[in-house]
Amino acid sequence: MKLNKPLVITAGEPAGIGPKLCSSLVNTNLLNEIVVIGDASLLDDKLKVIDTPFPAPVKAGCPDPRNAKTLLEGLEIAVKGCLSNKFSGMVTAPIAKNVIADAGISFTGHTEFLANLTNVDFPVMLLVANNLRVALASTHIPLRDVPDFITKERLIKILCVLQEDLKRKFQIKSPEILVCGLNPHAGESGHIGKEDEEIIAPVVKELAKSGMKVRGPISADTAFTAASGHKDAILA
């Protein structure tokens, strides 16, 4: 799809693969203009670049916490450009979260960082590949904390946000959503964990009764197979 304004790409961790990925775009026949935010000395000079030089020397494979602040400033430039309609959208190259944390900066991931910059109280991460759309019920938290994180209130909010965005951003008039179970085989009727039976199933039932086309909990090992039938999105 041809966009009216350029896409902005943040080059990510300077010691990682991001700058090389961005530089490879000069040999690609892109439909839209792109602008890259990063250290110009690490990027192909044919790219249109907003230069954000890093204070510490960059060595491939050896991220330096001294560069973390500049990296995040590049993300802020991209977000402000999108909010001011300078850019049509943004793409983020990989970063090293641990290096940012080592710099003493509170950072759990792009999702939460962008939500904070855009004053979004309840961000929902959606992964999209062609017609496969997967929303996540949790993002950057330890696995041991996930069961306590999956509450009825949270699931209802996520599913309502997902339904609305499928309508508004993907022009799907009446989206159908599958909800994955939390435990193996969606809990086997409560024999492998109680969350699917006590939390997920009641939420699905309540929203389905209100008119939402939602089904679950579905065992995660079968939700992505053709046998599950075509659905517009999966909540996992």
Model-inferred region functions:
Residues 1-110, 149, 153-236:
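Contiguous, glycine/small-aliphatic-enriched amphipathic segments in soluble metabolic enzymes
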Residues 44, 127-157:
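Ligand-binding beta-strand-loop-alpha-helix segment within the catalytic cores
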Residues 111-121:
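A glycine-rich helix N-cap at a beta->alpha junction
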Residues 126-127, 169:
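Short secondary-structure boundary/capping segments
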